[in-house]
């Protein structure tokens, strides 16, 4: 299921404070209801399992698992498993994502015990990452590919072994104007949706 909270008008920037705020808790429940409806449709269609190609939507993962008796592949967890195969413990791992994904800690949940997650500073988040995501949504991929570079360079200077592209739009911004050869050689980047797709194919073939 797509599972984007924004698709039903819910902004995820402050959702991590939901237990202290009734309005935010209401928004959380609204998104959960929408996700459950999508999962129910897939369950009725006799799907073997569910994948959610939205990073932020995994903030609802635990509640979904409790209510939907169907396996759901956890994308951040799959990225963590993939990272363990290529990076030593305590390595610095960069994360480019929306503020919603960063604030809800869907990647911290898996990475914090073994790695040091590095995020862009506030200025780069607003003026590089957020704008790049917005430009891709607007169809201006060329502008996105330019404006994301400062955030990438920041993480490289922080000696990150890998950089997680934790938003669906970011691989488009980074790879759209590169040849297939250059994309394959860009080993520093981790595309969660590609990792999720591979995990889904492996699970389906079992």
Regions found by a protein language model. Give the residues of each.
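Non-catalytic structural scaffold of enzyme domains
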Residues: 1-206
């Amino acid at each position: 299921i797509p599972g984007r909270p924004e698709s039903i008008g819910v902004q995820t920037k402050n959702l991590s404070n939901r237990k202290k705020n009734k309005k935010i808790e209401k928004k959380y429940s609204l998104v959960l209801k929408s996700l459950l409806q999508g999962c129910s449709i897939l369950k009725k269609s006799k799907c073997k399992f569910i994948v959610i190609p939205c990073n932020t939507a995994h903030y609802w993962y635990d509640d979904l698992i409790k209510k939907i008796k169907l396996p759901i592949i956890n994308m951040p967890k799959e990225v963590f498993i993939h990272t363990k195969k290529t990076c030593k413990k305590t390595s610095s791992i960069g994360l480019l994502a929306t503020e919603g994904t960063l604030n809800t800690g869907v990647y911290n949940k898996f990475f914090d015990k073994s790695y040091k997650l590095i995020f862009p500073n506030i200025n780069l988040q607003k003026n590089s990452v957020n704008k790049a995501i917005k430009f891709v949504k607007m169809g201006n991929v060329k502008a996105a590919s330019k404006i994301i570079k400062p955030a990438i360079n920041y993480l490289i200077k922080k000696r990150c072994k890998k950089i997680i592209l934790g938003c669906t739009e970011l691989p488009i911004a980074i790879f759209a104007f590169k040849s297939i050869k250059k994309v394959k050689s860009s080993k520093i980047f981790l595309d969660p949706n590609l990792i999720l797709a591979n995990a889904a194919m492996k699970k389906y073939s079992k």
